[in-house]
Amino acid sequence: MKRLAFFAAAVLTISGCQRAGAPALVRIGSKNFSEQVLLAEIVAQALEAKGLRVDRRLNLGGTFVCHKALVAGDLDLYPEYTGTAFTAILAKKPVADPAAVRKEVEGEYAKRWGVVWSPALGFENTFALVVRGEDARRWGLKTISDLRAHEAEIRPGFGYEFLEREDGFPGLARTYGLEFPRRPAQMDLGLLYPALESHQVDLIAGNSTDGLIAALGAAVLEDDRHYFPPYEAAFVVRGQVWKTNAAVREALERLGGKISADTMRKLNARLDRDKRRPEDVAKEFLKTLSSLSS
């Protein structure tokens, strides 16, 4: 019996040593749209190249799902936008100053949840009200204010978050005095552009870096009353992970300022227009980034 107990203890000790010596596991999440999945995949591959193990938890859902998973310790990092954090998570009124928004979200996230913001990736992805190009020309639509003259004819279709968030449709309607007779249809994000193209809806709330805008010949309406706050893209990271995992810090710092809005639109187009796999697009981007850095 003593020999058996000694053997069991030895096995536990050995297995514990194996776990301790194993590469760190990093859990990366994303929201449920193409750009988010791609950004998460880019960081996942960058970390795997450094020898880390990655648990991909992609397409989780919207902002609140990802945020709750992060602060609960179920995720280590995911891509986020400063304006989204400012208005949706911190429940603050939209502010136009990018530096002020960044400072506020950095401070509040650190104080409330011990979460760190990585360096900005180099682009903003703001909400964008999008119409078919033919309708923009036919109705003379250039700005969001122009919609008021055609409210009775327009069938809006929006995602759940845009319908509910303060920096989404509720505040937008108040700011611009919009009163659509037809209640906006609530749609899955992946269905917005197909619905617009097939004339099921006439107006959608997309994102300024969506690759399908140019591909479909759609038109983005100017936010002439400057309603939407800045939405600088970055990663939010659990403080303990940022502090103790040098590979995570190095990967995110290396990405800082490296993705312009034009680059992000082109990458998104490869996913949504060309139907490429996020894994392949991420691999190509990292290869290009490596060649530029060498």
Residue ranges of predicted features:
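C-terminal motif of bacterial Sec signal peptides marking the signal peptidase cleavage site
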Residues: I14-G16
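Bacterial signal peptide processing site
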Residues: Q18-A20
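Alpha-to-beta junction loops
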Residues: V71-E80, E151-R155, G171, A195-G206
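Ligand-binding "clamshell"
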Residues: I89-S118, S198-V201, L212-H226
